[in-house]
């Protein structure tokens, strides 16, 4: 083995030695699932783990109480690398996406790398970033806006899956709420006096369905009616729908957004209602991984004997705030 391979083996051995310690934290987070922006127990478990291994930890960065930044500064020149951890859960399901593993893997990798950096006097700054609200709220996008990632040369995250892959593909995504406002009236006695907001919502859905044919492959639009009225014998004066719009490219997604907006405006005109739009959560952009880093991941997977497949469009695609 050359020096690099010896160091990789040392890292692998250290990770195995500390496996039980890391598993306890992961199991604790799994057993205490917390929704976006409410991950107080998970945050504290990860922060205490990192502090116990000498990281300087700051809680509540970027105006998010459940975020954190853990730093090891070698005091020597070098790159700044961030390992990103997630730890929020899904409503009702819990940790169905394995965020207990993501948060713990980031902290665990940071602890192991810090020990190796100290032993071999490797320069640079190592950060572990606690990024809340990936499932709803896009905490990383908020952190980008607050400058948390400025000065970072590389940011990495591991996501569990049923197959190992060194690269990833994701949709850019935006969620919009459309509120249609009409005029109430009795649906039997004098419906002509009203303007039906629910009709506006229904017509918008039909218009969006007509547009699907014209969107590029690997684009998605899916929506639900969140408010449709309170009584069947009255003309609904307010109705709401939420649409999620996705595409492989952020710029094309925004073209789709313009088309969806036209569907809403046209539906409002046709039903003599009015429509208002509100963006829900942060926009998430498509992931564009650095190909050199991807190749390093491949080599490291080969080194430890990890079997993997290459990512492609047939495997199912989701969205994540990592792309921001």
Q: Where do the model's predicted regions map?
A:
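Acidic/His- and Gly-rich active-site-bordering loop/insert found
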Residues: 2-124
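Active-site oxyanion-binding pockets that recognize sulfate/phosphate
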Residues: 8, 12, 32, 36, ...
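Residue-level signal for inorganic ion chemistry
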Residues: 29, 143, 243
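Histidine/acidic-residue-rich, glycine-tolerant segments that coordinate divalent metal ions
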Residues: 66-71, 88-96, 100-101, 107-109, ...
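Metal-dependent amide/peptide-bond hydrolase catalytic core
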Residues: 202-324
